[in-house]
Amino acid sequence: MSTKGKVIKCKAAIAWEAGKPLSIEEVEVAPPKAHEVRVQIIAASVCRSDTYVINPAFKEGLLPVILGHECAGIVESVGPGVNNFKPGDKVIPLYVPHCRKCKFCQSPLTNFCTKFSEHKNPIIEQELMDDKTSRFTCKGKSIYHFLGISAFSQYTVVKDINLAKIDDDANLKRVCLIGCGFSTGYGAAINDAKVTPGSTCAVFGLGGVGLSAVIGCKTAGASRIIAVDINSDKFAKAKALGATDCLNPRELNKPVQDVIVEMTNGGVDFAIDCAGGSEVMKATVDCTTVGWGSCTFVGVNVNDKGLTISPVELILGRTLRGSSFGGWDVDTVPKLVSDYKNGKFNLEALVTHTLPFEKINEALDLLKQGKSIRTILIY
């Protein structure tokens, strides 16, 4: 029986309160409206960004909410005006929209879109659809969306400009990682930092994003990749993916940036911060060489005050830039999927656990405890 145009009842993990476990509930998912697509989620992964809104220290989050944004699925139905998707298409929802019409979409300099850049904080400002209503209801109460995706539901509704259509034979249980973590780190290295062959690099933070940045540096031909994390258990994985050296700041007798400068005769060519926080941001800057050192910032910490920097550090030739989703968009993500299929990079190494969707709280605990890189949730 067709579900097109009808409300779908399904299971979703709802965050009712900050600091509390998610609750598996039956939700009602409304049909897609104009330029919207309803997607059946097949597989998703847990990203640290999913935990920000339910962190008691984060005061701006809107609850109740269905979290999740790193996923892949199949189109169930489309709303009026949707011409580039049809039921049965395999897709990856993206938190970065791409309208193809605005000045950002038409520029080769960014993957931003007016629909994205108008948000001061996209983590909390894509909580409703364009008509300022939600497509989710539970127990008669409207439930907020998250990053325009809400992957922790068996069905979700997203805007068509937030969807990438991918190959029919794509393995959704792996390419779901391309929805955020892998693309963010890998692209930060090859698209935004533009790591060059023979260069030296430092990567701070060895979660899914940081390890993907290591893969990106290796793919770009870096001769030395220094991986930094306070969890030494991640070093074996980092070296397997291309890191030449690993440093734990807690095991050093001087600041890690000073050690890196000594190791590289003056500092690395490229440094990528995938951890966030003022201390790590400062170390990222300080570990790069004067003259041409490149600093790329990817990581975000809840309520962190950010970086304070002297103009002299910039006058000496360093460049600083931010990176969002690694420079990819809905038009370039399909090529990433093809590259994975053709063996250009390995997503398997990032997957440490696979769990049924109902065990989502276990997946979140593994992430918080530093025991997982990426846990795949199977719906």
Swiss-Prot record:
GO biological-process terms attached to the record: formaldehyde catabolic process
Coiled-coil regions listed in the entry: none
Keywords for this protein: Cytoplasm, Metal-binding, NAD, Oxidoreductase, Zinc
Gene name of the record: ADH2-2
EC category: oxidoreductase
Subunit structure: Homodimer.
Record lineage: Eukaryota, Metazoa, Chordata, Craniata, Vertebrata
Primary location class: cytoplasm
Protein family (similarity comment): Belongs to the zinc-containing alcohol dehydrogenase family. Class-II subfamily.
This enzyme's EC code(s): 1.1.1.1
PANTHER family associated with the record: ALCOHOL DEHYDROGENASE, ALL-TRANS-RETINOL DEHYDROGENASE [NAD(+)] ADH4
Cofactor note: Binds 2 Zn(2+) ions per subunit.
Keyword Metal-binding: yes
GO cellular component assignments: cytosol
Protein name: Alcohol dehydrogenase class-2 isozyme 2
Binding-site residues, Zn(2+) 1: 47, 69, 176
Localization per record: Cytoplasm
Matching CDD domains: alcohol_DH_class_I_II_IV
The protein's required cofactors: Zn(2+)
GO molecular function, one term: alcohol dehydrogenase (NAD+) activity
Catalysis performed (reactions): a primary alcohol + NAD(+) = an aldehyde + NADH + H(+); a secondary alcohol + NAD(+) = a ketone + NADH + H(+)
Keyword Protein transport listed: no
Residues the entry annotates as binding NAD(+): 205-210, 229, 234, 298-300, 374
